[in-house]
Amino acid sequence: MRRKACESKRGLKFNKVCHTTLFFPISCHVTASRIEVLYFRYFIVSLLVLFGVFKMDLEAKEVSGEIPNENALAELCRFCESADLSRIENFVGTYKNWCLSIIWPRNCWLRFTLRKDVAGYTEKMFEDMNDHYQGFVEKLCLLGTIQIPYRDVPILIGRSKRIFLHDLETDTLHFVCDNFEQFVRYGVLGTNIITCAEPVYRHGLYDGPRFESLENLRNNDVLRSPCTLNIHLKLNRKGVLGIKAMRKHYIAMLREFDELARCASLDDVERFVSLNVGRDLRLDMPVFKSLTLGTRDSVWIGTCRLANLEEQEDLVEKVVVLGYLNDHDYESKCTRPILCIGKSGKIYYYDWIDNVLVKLGDCLLTFLRVGFARLFADCGYEKIGKISMRFGRMSTLGMSETYQSCMSLSK
């Protein structure tokens, strides 16, 4: 009985002590080592309490928006994969002011919006850009914008399924990636278009693309005004001035070839060349500097080589001789390559050594871009470039298969 009474007294004492000392049983008779252990326990519990408060604060800041449609992203990917621009425009109109998270740059969101709602963007700017950048071939469509301090940057998709970024200040169209799926997976990563002071998301910090409403993001302080949003981001404009200077040379060269590109048949090409024999058309290419126009009769071709050329025509297609390709290394006309154009619009040169026709481009326009492939690679100039006077738009030879296929798609 005495033992039970003692145990009950000890229990009451333990409970009382626990209540008054944060569940640490402190008695009046403790050693120095036990005090150290108790202080260590108190320190651990304090850390746990602080961590719990910090976690609650993080959870309070976390965005929990309601996704407009569980299959919305898959639906948009399907439209972009099929390059159905009309459905993409309808999708953007339906989910206007909803945002899609991007893995890079950090805290960057693609906001679905219409052209009239983009700051500093006018309908005329879009039409001029679409026309100058061969919109009649690519036909660009606005997906939305990403925000960089003091500006909205439009993100566009073309009929080729490729994604582009339009820098409004320099009026430069930058190639981002080959399709929308790559854009969702990688963002603007590795394109050298946007520089970022912050590191890329690590594997565990990005939970995949998700939709959030613009209002919800602002209420949770995730998105602020464009003046203070993504202050660490900026557009990389190194080399833009150089590209602009080269573009002037490129446009000037296209102007010289514009009349030739508008020829609608081989007879028209032959007539144009015969009226301009000896005229030099400038070429900005790594090897060839100009094209001297000349007919099959005026261009020096031996009887044997002429027969070989005719044999090649039977094997490939009928061609019309345009003239000589000139360079300082070629001292005599006998060694200069002869440039030809085929009935399909393809460009060939006649190889003197192997006596064969070698294709240089699918059309005159792609041939003229050869010298600019390195400079304009990031801008997608292998298939899309800024041109003037609607180069070869009305020609069956100048644009050939590319133009005709795109016209059939646009109907």
Curated annotation (Swiss-Prot):
It comes from the Viruses. This is Protein U8. The gene is U8. InterPro entries: US22-like. It holds the Pfam family US22. It comes from Human herpesvirus 6B (strain Z29).
